[in-house]
Amino acid sequence: MARIAGVNIPDNKHTVISLTYIYGVGRTTAQKICAATGVNPAAKIKDLTDEQIEQLRGEVAKVNTEGDLRREVNMKIKRLMDLGCYRGLRHRKGLPVRGQRTKTNARTRKGPRKPIRK
């Protein structure tokens, strides 16, 4: 298994699919990385040379991924909560943020049902 950006990349999958195992790299970004390095997107990771894997590592390093990206997302959410805006309040209360209904749905965000006290 190759290791790129601190993530074990599966050997037996195509390069584009394998790169999506990195947090912050989707299909489009993976295709751009392959195009920039000149690596065949349909080639499997185990068939790549060490030099090609190093090129992939270099390109992935340019993209904001893994811990840095997670930290950035958390900081943006924390900023909304500190501002006290509507989205921040919804985050703070653990409710849906993007306008979804909550009367009947939103169980994932609200958590399990609480029994009604009499």
UniProtKB/Swiss-Prot annotation:
An example GO biological process term is: translation
Disordered: annotated span? 93-118
- What Pfam families is this protein classified in? Ribosomal_S13
Recorded GO CC terms: cytosol; small ribosomal subunit
Supply the alphabetized keyword list.
Ribonucleoprotein, Ribosomal protein, RNA-binding, rRNA-binding, tRNA-binding
Q: Does the keyword rRNA-binding apply?
A: yes
Gene3D superfamilies in the record, alphabetically? 1.10.8.50, 30s ribosomal protein s13, domain 2
Q: One MF term from GO for this chain?
A: rRNA binding
Q: Which domain of life is it from?
A: Bacteria
HAMAP family, A to Z: Ribosomal_uS13 (MF_01315)
Q: Give the matching NCBIfam families.
A: uS13_bact (TIGR03631)
| Protein family per UniProt | Belongs to the universal ribosomal protein uS13 family.
- Quaternary state and interactors: Part of the 30S ribosomal subunit. Forms a loose heterodimer with protein S19. Forms two bridges to the 50S subunit in the 70S ribosome.
Q: What does this protein do?
A: Located at the top of the head of the 30S subunit, it contacts several helices of the 16S rRNA. In the 70S ribosome it contacts the 23S rRNA (bridge B1a) and protein L5 of the 50S subunit (bridge B1b), connecting the 2 subunits; these bridges are implicated in subunit movement. Contacts the tRNAs in the A and P-sites.
Q: What is this protein called?
A: Small ribosomal subunit protein uS13
State the gene name recorded for this protein: rpsM
